[in-house]
């Protein structure tokens, strides 16, 4: 009877720990810690809003710099 009581107490302790933590106290299958294992799901790479487009990033390189317009003087073009 004492053995079954100890087993029930250990089972209750284990279930309460897993309910509080949300997961069993083990490492994820990739072998990293709990925080490093979940990091790939939390962080997403930055992407542009419009997508790559036809220029594929070369637009800045070939764009002609426009002169600044001032309030005084003639128009530059």
UniProtKB/Swiss-Prot annotation:
Q: Does the keyword Signal apply?
A: yes
From start to end residue, where is composition biased (Basic residues)?
A: 58-71
Query: Which keywords, in A-to-Z order, does the entry hold?
Result: Angiogenesis, Cleavage on pair of basic residues, Developmental protein, Gastrulation, Hormone, Secreted, Signal
What is one GO biological process annotated to this record? positive regulation of heart rate
Give me the ranges of the annotated region Disordered: 45-77
Q: What does this protein do?
A: Peptide hormone that functions as endogenous ligand for the G-protein-coupled apelin receptor (APLNR/APJ), that plays a role in cadiovascular homeostasis. Functions as a balanced agonist activating both G(i) protein pathway and beta-arrestin pathway of APLNR. Downstream G proteins activation, apelin can inhibit cAMP production and activate key intracellular effectors such as ERKs. On the other hand, APLNR activation induces beta-arrestin recruitment to the membrane leading to desensitization and internalization of the receptor.
Name this protein carries in UniProt: Apelin
Name the species this protein comes from: Rattus norvegicus
């Amino acid at each position: 009877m004492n053995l079954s009581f100890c087993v029930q107490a250990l089972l209750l302790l284990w279930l309460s720990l897993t309910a509080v933590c949300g997961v069993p106290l083990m490492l994820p299958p990739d072998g990293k810690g709990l925080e490093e294992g979940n990091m790939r799901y939390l962080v997403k790479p930055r992407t542009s809003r419009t997508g790559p487009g036809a220029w594929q990033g070369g637009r800045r390189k070939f764009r002609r710099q426009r002169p600044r317009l001032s309030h005084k003087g003639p128009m530059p073009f």
